[in-house]
């Protein structure tokens, strides 16, 4: 009997698999080692620019490319994607520096009291990010402007949106239905970890590729250069639209809280909470599916082990550090409360931070809710055992967290079934990334 779990049903199309087999037959001619300087020189030539601005990105880029070569076992599509992504990021860095030179006022923009949505991945952070940024008084980085931020005005806006849509269509081609697992769209809010990518100090790469060498090095680094570039990127985007509240989102911010606060000392935080084993299993499933696009050798059990280790340590670190913040600067929200009544959850958030929820903002949020697919919570299905995760892991790694925030999966007391609070099934299902 065929498994109903999403990772067992989710494979690249036959034409993509055939292309990757052809690439493998070339015996290394496609997936050769890529020297950093080759990509740097190519980016400079294509942009007709040579000033990357302050900050060393060459060492991080070197570690990333070396780990991709040694560890990631990229297929032909993966090698093409890596090269394309790095060239795009390098080109954007060159263009951002040029724009900053032409428009020195960009550096004067103040990023005031940005809200960071954090929490374990797959706890509703993406959904909440989209909902909150629908308020006309707020704003999030949008996918198209993160992919193509230059120029810092609205010049060629529609053309840039079309190009971003075409790029995203490529993902849908190599990974059909991925958008049902994680929303993808040129005009949708983008996770702001992408703003750190030009520093090449970002866990965005670790999500797409199996790069344990890079990951080990990355976790030991000072993230100051990454957050400084994050601010530079936001200042650049703010040149287009100033005066609105920034709504930002990335679970990985829990890892770098002290550095984040050094850059954004008045930052606010919204932390979402879900049964940890459900969240870890869900993100392990998502990473497995994504990496299978770029590699033909993906180990779900290894992904599960890496995920629970990283997020257990990151969450424990963040909880200890967030307790030093004034209570009015952080709000806690249950994933189940968000799913039961999103508008009520938003009202509580606004009340906590002293914001005004205008009728127009609420109407726009309700429009988003009305457009949610009927099968949003049913497409992504997964079970812990596929990733080497066991019921007892929840209490073993997250017991204190579960007790403090009143979360926990029934899986912790039912070794046979993995059950979500809303779907009585052998599988957990979700859709609020």
Language-model features and meaning:
Residues 118-120, 247-251, 335:
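Short His-Asn-centered micro-motif
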Residues 116-135:
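Glycine-rich phosphate-binding P-loop
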Residues 134-144:
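Post-Walker A helix-loop "phosphate-sensing" segment adjacent to the P-loop in P-loop NTPases
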Residues 1-98, 210-227, 237-241, 283-433:
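PAPS-dependent sulfotransferases, especially Golgi type II membrane carbohydrate sulfotransferases
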Residues 233, 239-266:
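Flexible, glycine/threonine-enriched loop-and-boundary segments that flank and lead into catalytic domains
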Residues 98-108:
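Pre-Walker A adenine-sensing motif
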Residues 145-246:
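PAPS-dependent sulfation machinery
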Residues 249, 260-285:
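Conserved phosphate-donor/acceptor-positioning beta-strand/loop module used by diverse small-molecule
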């Amino acid at each position: 009997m065929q498994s109903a779990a999403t990772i067992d049903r989710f494979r690249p199309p036959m034409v993509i698999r055939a292309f990757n087999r052809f690439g493998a037959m070339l015996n290394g001619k496609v997936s050769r080692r890529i020297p950093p300087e080759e990509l740097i020189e190519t980016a400079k030539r294509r942009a007709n620019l040579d000033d990357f601005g302050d900050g060393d990105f060459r060492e991080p880029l070197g570690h990333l490319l070396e780990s991709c070569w040694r560890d990631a076992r990229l297929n032909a599509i993966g090698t093409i994607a890596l090269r394309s992504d790095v060239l795009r990021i390098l080109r954007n860095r060159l263009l951002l520096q040029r724009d900053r030179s032409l428009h020195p006022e960009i550096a004067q923009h103040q990023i005031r009291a940005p809200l960071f949505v954090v929490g374990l991945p797959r706890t509703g952070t993406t959904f909440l990010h989209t909902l909150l940024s629908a308020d006309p008084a707020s704003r999030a980085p949008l996918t198209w402007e993160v992919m193509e931020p230059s120029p810092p005005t609205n010049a060629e806006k529609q053309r840039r949106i079309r190009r971003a849509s075409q790029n995203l269509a490529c993902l849908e081609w190599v990974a059909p239905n991925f958008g049902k697992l994680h929303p993808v769209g040129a005009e949708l809010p983008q996770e702001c970890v992408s703003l750190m990518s030009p520093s090449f100090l970002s866990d965005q790469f670790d999500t797409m590729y199996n790069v344990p060498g890079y990951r080990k090095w990355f976790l030991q680094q000072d993230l100051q250069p990454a957050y400084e570039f994050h601010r530079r990127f936001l200042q650049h985007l703010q040149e287009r639209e100033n005066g609105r509240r920034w709504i930002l989102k990335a679970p990985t911010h829990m890892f770098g809280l002290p550095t984040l606060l050094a850059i954004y000392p008045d930052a606010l935080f919204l932390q979402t909470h879900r049964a940890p084993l459900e969240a870890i299993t869900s993100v392990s499933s998502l990473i497995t599916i994504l990496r299978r696009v770029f590699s033909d050798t993906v180990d779900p059990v290894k992904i599960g082990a890496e995920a629970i280790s990283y997020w257990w340590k990151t969450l424990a670190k963040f909880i200890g550090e967030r307790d030093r913040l004034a209570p009015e600067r952080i709000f806690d929200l249950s994933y189940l409360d968000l799913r039961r009544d999103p508008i009520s959850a938003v009202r509580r958030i606004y009340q906590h931070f002293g914001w005004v929820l205008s009728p127009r903002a609420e109407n726009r949020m309700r429009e988003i809710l009305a457009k949610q697919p009927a099968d949003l919570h049913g497409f992504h299905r997964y079970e812990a055992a596929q990733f080497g995760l066991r019921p007892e892991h929840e209490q073993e790694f997250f017991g204190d967290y579960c007790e403090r925030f009143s979360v926990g999966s029934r899986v912790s007391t039912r070794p046979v079934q993995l059950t979500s609070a809303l779907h009585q099934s052998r599988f957990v299902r979700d859709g609020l990334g």
